[in-house]
Amino acid sequence: DDNFFISRVKPKQRFRNQNTQVLKDLNETNDKRLVAWVPFNNPETNALPDGIFDSEVFSLWSYVSHWGNWTAPLGRVPAALMDVAHKNGVAVSSAGTVPYGSLSDEWRSEFRLLNTLDAQKLADYLYYYGQDGLGYNSEWSEFNNITRDLRNKHIAVNKLMESRNPIFENMWYGLTTDRGRLSFGNMLDNNFEQTFGNKDNKAFSLFLNYNWNSDLVLRTSVDYAKTMERDPLYLYAGVNMQGGEPRTNSWPYLKNYPVSIGLWGAHSKNMFWESRNEKGSSEETMQRSYMLRTERYFTGGTRNPANTPEVTSAMKYNVDNKDWHGMSTWMTAKSTLSWNLAEEPFISYFNLGNGKFFNWKGERKNNNSWYNIGVQDYLPTWRWWFSTNLLGRNVPETGLDAEFTWDDAYVGGSCVRVFGTHTNEYLHLFKTQYALQTGDVITFRYKHLSGSGDVKLVLTAKGSETSPINENAYTLLTRDQAIDDEHWVEKTFTVGSELAGKDLALIALHFENANNINMYLGECSIVRGTARTPETPTITSSNLLAFNKSGVDGKLI
């Protein structure tokens, strides 16, 4: 059904504020991009919603620029994946997974049909469905014409999409050259000049083959991109996660060059997801293992981008990957939380998009397993940035920790758990750029399970990011407060003169005198006025598909 493949969320725009970055020396010239050119979830269902709790809920979107859905056939991507990615400013594309070698008759026919299609129609199709590009596993060989025509078609589509979708990006694997022949040069040179394209004729971003690990290759590629007046950050150093390639001397080379990172692996499942049973095979154990794998891979072995380990040439992605430097070594955590609050409120229930039950505003509605990545909330920007100084990198050896839990939720099937002991520590939650007005309502909701501590909500403004605004006015929890592990505590604050007219730059929590504290975070929101009640939807058709003791499956359009 088309409705499951039409994204209803337009890509949100990311913003840059170096004052709320972990690494202040990263800017638009060296802040690496990342393409995850990998499958999503299981190949049978991809990102389509279903009733399976143990499904993939990727959540580190702030470190991803583009998700190339490897098991989504060319031109067909589940809307749920596009919706959550677009909320976070991430592009999503499908993949033409052409086999290695001479171009088959089937793919010749496919490409000829594509090449005869009017560029405007192709652009309209992609825009209608919400797709942000097309990707090609270009490791074929043919006699130029098909490859040339395919390239020219994408140049035309790029020009049409430039004003309609600013994150639109086509991907090309760097084996098939401009002339349709195979090359293992692993770099941008005259073999890929037209495929990459100059500033006026952009065709594809180039995913370099896996042997890019030399100064000569990287320097040549960067210099060549600059002569074409293209940003070299649209060159992706390919990483074969399945094969562990490049096998030696890899990551340290990237420190010196503005080349981005491209992840591949494997054909049917991504490597984070495929072997998530390394710590056990229960559904929740596998979900926790997957979460730890991705958190360590993207934010370092500490799961805190403020104190990542030293850069190595390792290619690991397992649960105990504690010595891994993490993608946050190379790139900032991106945020889209900057829109006009009069048009849309900011609301996060810390919901991952799956669960063993479904809660609505603290009430259990059912105990059925469910999955819909498309309803995932905005999640903490940097992921567990703890520090003893605000926006700092002073991380204690032992202190507070945080994780997602599927044991409770205010809305959905998950929430955030913060726990541990420390006298003074900050947890940075959201990088924002909201223009606040008098009367805006800030709500924070939590559940205090055990332990004690003083917890305050920290808000800072653009231009004075390290200075909390009247922190004592935003108390959430005091150390002598009674424990209540059954009820969600709501704290609301109305924006007054201290915040009105300022751009909110940071939302954080300040923990003082924490002693074995254990609390759940269930909501963080900023709402202006009252939301307009949407029009009642018109049901054009309904169909009962199946029913059993667990519930009913139906279809409404």
Feature map (PLM): residue ranges:
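Substrate-binding cleft of secreted/luminal carbohydrate-active enzymes
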Residues: D1-R8, L235-P396
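Chitinase-like catalytic core of GlcNAc-active glycosidases
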Residues: L26-G51, S55-V217
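Substrate-binding surface in catalytic domains of secreted glycosidases
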Residues: N137-T312
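Extra-cytoplasmic beta-strand recognition segments
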Residues: T381, V416, Y426-V455, K491-F493, ...
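Short carbohydrate-recognition loop motifs
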Residues: T398-Y426
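Extracellular carbohydrate recognition and processing domains
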Residues: E465-K502, A514
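Extracellular carbohydrate recognition
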Residues: L499-K502, F511-V527
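Pro/Thr/Ser/Gly-rich low-complexity, intrinsically disordered linker/stalk tracts
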Residues: T530-I557
